[in-house]
UniProtKB/Swiss-Prot annotation:
Gene3D superfamilies: 3.70.10.10. Plays an essential role in viral DNA replication by acting as the polymerase accessory subunit. Associates with the viral polymerase to increase its processivity and forms high-affinity direct interactions with DNA. Facilitates the origin-binding protein UL9 loading onto DNA thus increasing its ability to assemble into a functional complex capable of unwinding duplex DNA. This is DNA polymerase processivity factor. The keyword RNA-binding does not apply. It comes from the Viruses. Its main location: host cell. Belongs to the herpesviridae DNA polymerase processivity factor family. It comes from Human herpesvirus 1 (strain 17) (HHV-1). Residues 398-409 have a biased composition (Basic and acidic residues). A motif (Bipartite nuclear localization signal) lies at residues 394-413.
Length: 488
């Protein structure tokens, strides 16, 4: 599952005869990306809520599309643009990476800012040269008062390829995912802690209730499996009976849909940047994706709509309680204390402080007492000493830019768990096997870009000549579906 050096993405048939009047790509340019018409309007709509958040980003370009990678408040943000979203997308050669910022003022992505060019008509990216010393030239056209297309030569930007780069692309299938509408996600964000001293608990109880709470605030929803008929949903019936003064619309507002909602868990998130990141990105509705059985557990929030931006928040393994592992699917042996303390009936969207206390102290999820009460505490091993590296660039001898390490996983905060040493996580595909039940299941293999593991590391090191498969090989299918950035 590697990129084909000579692979060419099929061009979209939306080109028209006006291309000739708008200029041709540079002679011998092996790669060309064109935006105009409906495709240009779609990209402008996708960037509209992002404002200036992604102006200083890393652009990873390959035969599958463009991946925009950035860091906001220390958290990883990804925005994929598939080749079908462009009017023309032609690519030959290995994957390339470019820093979007040109001169500390202008960016390759500035053209997509709202009202930057009111009469914008066409955007073209042409990449010439030989890897890893290729050059990207961005040209734009606007429409004059006479309806003619004119190129703005003064706005032409040029950028050299990064001779070396590293980017971590999450991948894999989430253990549990829940889809929230814009009002529902807003309530969840309002319930999250604003500082590290106020941890937030995400909990999916055995009674089918999804709760997000702190010591002072709580919001709850009925979690329903995607595609289940409303006539067979007990939780919907409970909600309909409880809301005597409301109609079906009110019941739907308190119901979230997702996949694997039978997998009960409790997760304590002490990262205070979640609310700030999602508000900066202006995420409306979104999907919460919980990756809890991997060596590096995380929570991913993917926005719905045209932009499909994803933010990844890393979790502490010792603050994760998985109740469904070790039991048959859909029949966890014990629910969490928060679900049992609050009863089986979902509460209203915003509860009082006293009701939130009845859910239990989130810190209780971290101790041995909680492990004994829940029946099983399955925590993933702590990641090895990994640190977040700030992207740095320097000029190479050949004139190309060099970014040694663009990003890496952040190191968890200090602190020792009070629970017993965690056991090896049980893979989902072997959770009912006899070997897994006996605790002899093998540890998952180390992350590999081609094995469908949690993280794939893509790189090119110019001095050594080492290189990984293209950065989009993770989205080509294989044993696991993509991480959820919008690619099929």
């Amino acid at each position: 599952m590697t990129d084909s050096p000579g692979g060419v993405a099929p061009a979209s048939p939306v080109e028209d005869a006006s291309d000739a009047s708008l200029g041709q790509p540079e002679e011998g340019a092996p790669c060309q990306v064109v935006l105009q018409g409906a495709e240009l309007n779609g990209i402008l709509q996708a960037f509209a809520p992002l404002r200036t958040s992604l102006l200083d980003s890393l652009l990873v370009m390959g035969d599958r599309g463009i991946l925009i990678h950035n860091t906001i408040f220390g958290e990883q943000v990804f925005l994929p643009l598939e080749h079908s979203q462009f009017s023309r997308y032609r690519w030959r050669g290995p994957t390339a990476a470019f820093l979007s910022l040109v001169d500390q003022k202008r960016s390759l992505l500035s053209v997509f800012r709202a009202n930057q060019y009111p009469d914008l008509r066409r955007v073209e990216l042409a990449i010439t040269g030989q890897a890893p010393f290729r050059t990207l030239v961005q040209r734009i056209w606007t429409t004059t008062s006479d309806g003619e297309a004119v190129e703005l030569a003064s706005e032409t930007l040029m950028k050299r390829e990064l001779t070396s780069f590293v980017v971590l692309v999450p991948q894999g299938t989430p253990d549990v995912q829940l889809r929230l509408t814009r009002p529902q996600l807003t309530k969840v964000l309002n319930a999250t802690g604003a500082d590290s001293a106020t941890p937030t608990t995400f909990e999916l109880g055995v009674n089918g209730k999804f709760s997000v709470f702190t010591t002072s605030t709580c919001v709850t929803f009925a979690a329903r499996e995607e595609g289940v008929s409303s006539s067979t949903s007990t939780q919907v019936q409970i909600l309909s009976n409880a809301l005597t003064k409301a109609g079906q619309a009110a019941a739907n507002a308190k119901t979230v849909y997702g996949e694997n909602t039978h997998r009960t868990f409790s997760v304590v998130v002490d990262d205070c940047s979640m609310r700030a990141v999602l508000r900066r990105l202006q995420v409306g509705g979104g999907t919460l994706k919980f990756f809890l059985t991997t060596p590096v557990p995380s929570l991913c929030v993917t926005a719905t709509g045209p932009n499909a931006v994803s933010a990844v928040f890393l979790l502490k393994p010792q603050k994760i309680c998985l109740d469904w592992l070790g039991h048959s699917q859909g029949s966890p042996s014990a629910g969490s204390s928060a679900s049992r303390a609050s009863g089986s009936e979902p509460t209203d969207s915003q509860d009082s402080a006293s009701d939130a206390v009845s859910h239990g102290d989130p810190e209780d999820l971290d101790g041995a007492a909680r492990a004994g009460e829940a029946g099983a505490l399955h925590a993933c091993p702590m990641p090895s000493s990994t640190t977040r590296v700030t992207p740095t660039t320097k000029r190479g001898r050949s004139g190309g830019e060099d970014a040694r390490a663009d990003t890496a996983l952040k190191k968890p905060k200090t602190g020792s768990p009070t629970a017993p040493p965690p056991a090896d996580p049980v893979p989902l595909d072997t959770e009912d096997d006899s070997d897994a039940a006996d605790g002899t299941a093998a540890r998952p293999a180390a992350p590999d870009a081609r094995s469908g593991s949690r993280y794939a590391c893509y790189f090119r090191d110019l001095p050594t000549g080492e290189a990984s498969p293209g950065a989009f090989s993770a989205f080509r299918g294989g044993p696991q579906t993509p991480y959820g950035f919008g690619f099929p």
